[in-house]
């Protein structure tokens, strides 16, 4: 059985919580783009599943470069997909980054400039996907890192007619209970707007939701993302976080992070 955490590669130097990172595993923005090892985990999953060129939905793509969780799949393996980003300037830069990468050819990209939420029909992930993919219901990878409505958008996706083999979702490392920010909390656009911890959902809440729909938690790229695989495709290949322990996902934060972010204790929704 494979422990996927052993395959984490792609760490932003001086901006990850892992103190000792081998040089070949550091994010160099050519081989790796992720922040805390996500690139290596995804690479190993799709190697074992024998998916050489897949299709993704990338919710919260930023500039498709700095700490991107799909760029390596695109540039190295030629993946296709849908990029979703509310910041139009960031999305434009992302398009330029792809256009200037000589490794990318024969790919099919779609770009959507808008929010992801369940508050308006034009922001629902199922409606957005339907605007770009007709008849296609299963994707190889869904990523959601939007610093706001992760729980609600993931629930909307899973309860609809779309599915994914692998899901990467951003979580809130500061919460240990099974809680989420409410569906109508103020969204945060870009890292500069994250001045408190009132966003996304805790790892236990997201794990509970994913398990309900047949997904297993196979990697925690602490303190940013959880990676799940549909149990149909796991079949005992990858070690599962069962039971999920607080030490696996919780991070107390460093001085820089805690100074920038107010700790919000009220308003969380218990799941």
Model-identified regions with their sequence ranges:
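Helix N-cap/coil-helix junction residues
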Residues: 51, 103-104, 134-136, 162
